């Protein structure tokens, strides 16, 4: 009777520790996911403030500089 009781307690402790280990392993990934979600939302909010035609202004400006640099002088 004692052996069955000890075996049952051991299995319960084993299952509980396994679940706790899984939970504590999950917490850092949840925190990382929340942080990246907030950063992504902040980025989307900043992009929404700019007009669509001005969003890629710097890229177009660099393309024009490259185009003018390659044009021959007349």
Swiss-Prot record:
Its main location: secreted. It is found in: Secreted; Target cell membrane. Changing residue 25 to R: Increase in antibacterial activity. GO terms for cellular component: extracellular region; membrane; other organism cell membrane. The modification Lysine amide is found at residue 39. Mucroporin: cationic host defense peptide that have antibacterial activity by breaking membranes. Is more effective on Gram-positive than on Gram-negative bacteria. Minimum inhibitory concentrations (MIC) are the following: MIC=>100 ug/ml against E.coli AB94012, MIC=>100 ug/ml against P.aeruginosa AB93066, MIC=25 ug/ml against B.thuringiensis AB92037, MIC=50 ug/ml against B.subtilis AB91021, MIC=25 ug/ml against S.aureus AB94004, and MIC=25 ug/ml against the methicillin-resistant coagulase-negative Staphylococcus. Its synthetic analog mucroporin-M1 is more effective. The keyword Metal-binding does not apply. Belongs to the non-disulfide-bridged peptide (NDBP) superfamily. Short antimicrobial peptide (group 4) family. Changing residue 28 to K: Increase in antibacterial activity. This is Mucroporin. The keyword Secreted applies. One of its GO terms (biological process) is regulation of defense response to virus. Keywords: Amidation, Antibiotic, Antimicrobial, Antiviral protein, Cleavage on pair of basic residues, Membrane, Secreted, Signal, Target cell membrane, Target membrane, Transmembrane. Residues 45-74 form a propeptide. Expressed by the venom gland.
